């Protein structure tokens, strides 16, 4: 069966190297690997002249000249200059091999947090037993407890209100469909006294704080005892609640399931996404005192102010490059480790961050909501529209340091600078070839001299005669 380049036929590794037998998930990765066997070694070390098939191999080779300790991955043999980078890289192997299966449907997930979210959304616990008084549903074991606590014996089915009746709280705007719900809610507005036996039953013996429910008191007591029953399998950190553990695990996996529909930016928590969306709605209460720019979140203002002060508190341990935000450093580290955990289900292309994947998916869907008011051209993200509008305004802010040419945005400058790099590489290759040919034809003991004036004139005459 023919498979389009770059698209995996299955989730296995169907593309095998005919030389060493190593398998790959995508054909493009196999082609890059085969360069090492085929002698296509375009990257040359300036110190010793050794050539490598990939830029990453050349970078590892140069560490040997610096006398730097190398950390080798036992799974694939890739080398790293720092142990922290090796740890990040090993996570890619763990996620591939130790997937988490769902016991109910068999679907597999790369990490525990994704499995937990799947079970909550797709397999919620069955609650077939409905309360006849308030219409709430419970598992069989929880229904008797609910009836005894929320509906005392004096409550009967005959006196139950119609479902459309609402019970309003006199202390706040909230309303409830049952008197029991209002009763439970009203406890948060009452400061219990020491003479109240109900308050005494749910009072903390350590600090004296009272609670309306025994389950709330139990969770509170865990703070005093230091008990944290929900442990992170990655780092061992404990948490009081499973929901907090799920949010913490996203710091290990980099998972950001909440995406902004306007700009593609992703967040690990829904509350952070809601705060971010204020910026698209015009709400920017946090103002920079230096330039007057507004932000929807205070943290975004703090990160922005570092652009004025030059502060970059998050340096890369591999190349020393500094970043204003920890998340930017995390994404940058993946360029060293080669980790691309997010892949497109349609074409197999992989990405270092989920926001780039979301933007890429818009290209498949043809969704380009950002339209230029000048020419009508549409773009998938607002940042590309902003760059495009500079061409209408005639702004050229990106300058090439080699030739002084200006460009309207950084991508055009990067493409232009590649031409300088290609020219330098071609000149270096030509110099190397000339040196090799000279040594082979003349020999080390002879001295190469230029042609005499008479030879030059004869050469010119012969060349002219050949072309006529």
Swiss-Prot record:
Q: What is its main location?
A: nucleus
Q: Where in the cell is it found?
A: Nucleus
Query: Could you state one GO biological process linked to this protein?
Result: regulation of transcription by RNA polymerase II
Q: Which domain of life is it from?
A: Eukaryota
Q: Name one GO molecular function term.
A: zinc ion binding
> A Pfam family name for this chain?
zf-C2H2_4
- Keywords for this protein: DNA-binding, Metal-binding, Nucleus, Repeat, Transcription, Transcription regulation, Zinc, Zinc-finger
Q: Is Transcription regulation one of the keywords?
A: yes
Zinc fingers (C2H2-type): which spans?
A: 15-37, 43-65, 71-93, 100-123, 129-151, 167-189, 202-224, 230-252, 258-280, 286-308, 314-336, 342-364, 370-392, 398-420
Fetch the PROSITE patterns from UniProt.
ZINC_FINGER_C2H2_1, ZINC_FINGER_C2H2_2
Per the record, what is one GO cellular component?
nucleus
Q: What does this protein do?
A: May be involved in transcriptional regulation.
Q: Which family does it belong to?
A: Belongs to the krueppel C2H2-type zinc-finger protein family.
- Provide the protein name: Zinc finger protein 672
Give the gene name.
Znf672
